[in-house]
UniProtKB/Swiss-Prot annotation:
UniProt cross-references to InterPro entries, sorted A to Z: IQ_motif_EF-hand-BS, Neuromodulin, Neuromodulin_C, Neuromodulin_gap-junction_N, Neuromodulin_P_site
Post-translational modification: Palmitoylated. Palmitoylation is essential for plasma membrane association.
Main localization (coarse): membrane
Function in brief: This protein is associated with nerve growth. It is a major component of the motile 'growth cones' that form the tips of elongating axons. Plays a role in axonal and dendritic filopodia induction.
Membrane topology, from the record: Peripheral membrane protein
Any one cellular-component term (Gene Ontology): growth cone membrane
UniProt record similarity statement: Belongs to the neuromodulin family.
Biased composition (Low complexity): 80-95, 118-131, 172-198
Annotated compartments: Cell membrane; Cell projection, Growth cone membrane; Synapse; Cell projection, Filopodium membrane
The encoding gene: GAP43
Protein name: Neuromodulin
Keyword field: Calmodulin-binding, Cell membrane, Cell projection, Developmental protein, Differentiation, Growth regulation, Lipoprotein, Membrane, Neurogenesis, Phosphoprotein, Synapse
Ranges of compositional bias, category Basic and acidic residues: 1-26, 132-147, 159-171, 208-220, 232-241
Disordered as annotated region, ranges: 1-241
């Protein structure tokens, strides 16, 4: 029922206007055709002689008097290629727009690749510096462990000398490894740190030497005390006997 009402509304509008849309289109087509033909006939009139002008005018009048159906068909044919041309132009514009959009995208990709390329060397340069620092830390750890061992052991100064001999080649190897492995400013910082660490290690080694000397000095005092205790015990045993 609703569809029927819509159709009735359309019919009422047509009745009010008194002219159907098809009639409007047909009239517009006939006007366009008439103007187009009149333009062609004017060109012909200009090119032809004055005597032939009445004949051309009569031909134009005859063409205008042709059936309206033929005029409408010609109008549709003329409009169809125009529509196709407009569609082709739109598609060409869209293709150009897509090309333009793709070009910036490619440029952005290129820029992104350049950015990543510039960023990659920095981590690569940082890794050798980090590795050198790790090496120095690893070398310092066993050295620090060796120094407490030398202090805790109540051994003579020979072990302390051996520990020093072991530490010296390690200290010599660490800066050499740093200088060969790194060439960046970060590497220079790492080498500075590495040179500072051996200095600290030398200070620690000197402290261990002092500790060993102190231990050796305390040994004779302890032995003297033990001997005195033994002598007192022997004296007491003799008195008891």
């Amino acid at each position: 029922t609703k569809q029927v009402e819509k159709n009735e509304d359309g019919d009422q509008k047509i009745e009010q206007d008194g002219i159907k849309p098809e009639d409007k289109a047909h009239k517009a087509a006939t006007k366009i055709q008439a103007s187009f033909r009149g333009h062609i006939t004017r060109k012909k009139l200009k090119g032809e002689k004055k005597g032939d002008a009445p004949a051309s005018e009569t031909d134009a009048a005859d063409k205008k008097e042709e059936g309206p159906a033929g005029g409408a068909a010609e109008n549709k044919e003329s409009e169809a290629p125009a529509a196709t041309e407009a569609a082709a132009a739109d598609s060409a514009q869209q293709e150009e727009g897509s090309k333009d959009s793709s070009a910036p995208a490619e440029e952005k990709k290129g820029d992104g690749a350049a950015d990543t390329g510039s960023e990659q060397p920095a981590p690569q340069a940082a890794t050798p510096a980090a590795s050198s620092e790790e090496k120095t830390a690893a070398a310092a750890a066993p050295e620090r462990e060796s120094t407490p061992k030398a202090s805790t052991d109540n051994s003579p100064s020979l072990k302390a000398d051996e520990a020093q001999d072991k530490e010296e080649p390690k200290q010599a190897d660490v800066p050499a490894a740093d200088t060969t492995a790194t060439t960046t400013p970060a590497a220079e910082d790492a080498t500075a740190k590495a040179t500072a660490q051996p200095q600290m290690e030398t200070v620690e080694s000197s402290q261990t030497e002092e500790k060993t000397d102190a231990v050796e000095e305390t040994k004779p005092t302890e032995s003297a005390q033990q001997e005195e205790m033994k002598e007192e015990e022997s004296k007491a045993d003799q008195e008891n006997a």
